[in-house]
Regions:
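Active-site beta->alpha loop and helix N-cap motifs at the rims of alpha/beta catalytic domains
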Residues: 2, 8-15, 19-102, 106, ...
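Catalytic alpha/beta core domains of metabolic enzymes, predominantly
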Residues: 108-190
Length: 190
């Protein structure tokens, strides 16, 4: 079954959707936090984490390897349900394999975000172990916005990650309800 995660940061909405059995987790990011009025990222994130026992992905905002690792270690301590959200590449286009490997080897649950290709999924799979939980968030909506069909990339990413019982593929950047049906048909995890 394809699970539904809410990509929100508004405290009232987190409370509301946490009560819904249909919702199985939450993802956030610094932009959503700012829009929700967060002044202190850590404090606001911890408030969200207190509301729910469901998985919550909180993103690092550093752009370099050293600081991403430091932030990831701090964020992981905010709660047992926390996934540290790390971009697959930084703003310079560099693959963040060292960050992924370092945090994953510390048994820190990860949500690798802004993934666009099956090649990136392969790189991620090479960087992780087969025990610590990892979500790979593939940006379907943004791909479709540029005229690219995300379906083949999802099929390939799901196929190559099948041997990794600790990995879940997330249909990210959802644009319309039909995207859920597409994800479900592909047996996308989230």
């Amino acid at each position: 079954m394809t699970k539904i995660f809410c990509d929100i940061a508004d405290i009232k909405l987190v409370r509301k959707f946490d009560k819904k059995k249909l919702v199985k987790g939450f993802t956030t990011n610094p932009s959503l936090m700012r829009r929700a009025g967060a002044k202190d990222y850590a404090k606001y994130s911890k408030e969200i984490i207190k509301i729910t026992r469901k998985p919550v992905s909180c993103e690092v905002f550093a752009d370099d390897i050293k600081n991403m690792i430091l932030q990831g270690k701090k964020i992981s301590k905010w709660g047992k349900n926390v996934y540290v959200k790390v971009p697959v590449i930084n703003s310079k286009g560099k693959f963040m394999g060292k960050v992924i490997k370092s945090l994953n080897n510390r048994k820190i649950k990860l949500n690798i975000t802004a993934v666009y290709t099956a090649k990136q999924t392969k790189q991620i799979l090479k960087a992780i172990n087969r025990k610590t939980k990892v979500i790979i968030s593939i940006f379907a909506g943004r791909m479709a916005d540029t005229g690219n069909d995300p379906i083949p990339r999802f099929k390939e990413s799901i196929r190559i990650s099948k041997k990794y019982k600790n990995v879940q593929i997330l249909w990210a950047s959802t644009r319309e309800p039909y995207n859920y049906l597409q994800a479900k048909k592909l047996r996308c995890h989230i």
